[in-house]
């Protein structure tokens, strides 16, 4: 499966991969946790990732009106990308965290459900948005973000991730919206 490889050379990808720490058996046995905190500790790599996201937007001719990101780590990369593109950032949060009137969506998790909210005036009809987050696994959170945006009449033109865990069905769940991930790991 090809993601972004035609845009970035192997040296660039490998230098970025070196900033991700893998922690076996966290938070539970059998999980290989991909820790992004070393990358977050580096201004150089935060800038590099943001510039790579801009390059992907340009390469795909994505011209968004806003960037949307879910709590919590979508709040890291979303505002950085939005600032570089000269557009706004729209936060999607857990229930009760936004101060004004909101719309919400409940979505299923493997063992239970979750709720996300967005201000009801954050997006207007015809707004083009990109959803960004640190990690794509099953796609449930991003699918919920997409549905919230679409409820308000927005068009999700792309999804951006620092890391994608392959083989968990996220690409099928988010189809036909394009997905670009900087780093790909087996689930």
Regions found by a protein language model. Name each.
Residues 87-130:
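Short, glycine/charge-rich flexible loops or terminal/linker lids adjacent to PRPP-binding catalytic cores
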Residues 2-63:
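Active-site-facing substrate-recognition patch
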Residues 76-85, 146:
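Short Gly/Thr/Asp-enriched flexible loops that form oxyanion-binding sites at enzyme active sites
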Residues 62-71:
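Short glycine-rich phosphate-binding loop at a beta-alpha junction
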């Amino acid at each position: 499966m090809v993601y972004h490889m035609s845009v970035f050379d192997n040296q660039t990808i490998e230098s970025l991969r070196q900033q991700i720490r893998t922690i076996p058996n966290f938070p539970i046995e059998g999980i290989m946790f991909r820790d992004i905190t070393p990358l977050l500790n580096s201004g150089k790599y935060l800038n590099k990732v943001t510039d790579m996201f801009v390059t992907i937007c340009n390469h795909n001719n994505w011209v968004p009106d806003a960037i949307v990101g879910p709590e919590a780590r979508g709040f890291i990369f979303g505002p950085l990308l939005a600032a570089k593109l000269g557009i706004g950032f729209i936060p999607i949060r857990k229930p009760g965290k936004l101060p004004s009137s909101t719309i919400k969506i409940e979505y299923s998790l493997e063992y239970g459900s979750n709720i996300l909210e967005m201000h009801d005036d954050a997006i207007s009809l015809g707004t083009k948005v990109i959803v960004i987050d640190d990690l794509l696994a099953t796609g449930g959170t991003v699918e919920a973000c997409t549905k919230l945006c679409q409820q308000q009449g927005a068009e999700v033109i792309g999804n951006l991730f620092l890391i994608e865990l392959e083989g968990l069905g996220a690409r099928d769940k988010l189809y036909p919206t394009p997905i670009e991930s900087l780093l790909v790991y087996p689930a």
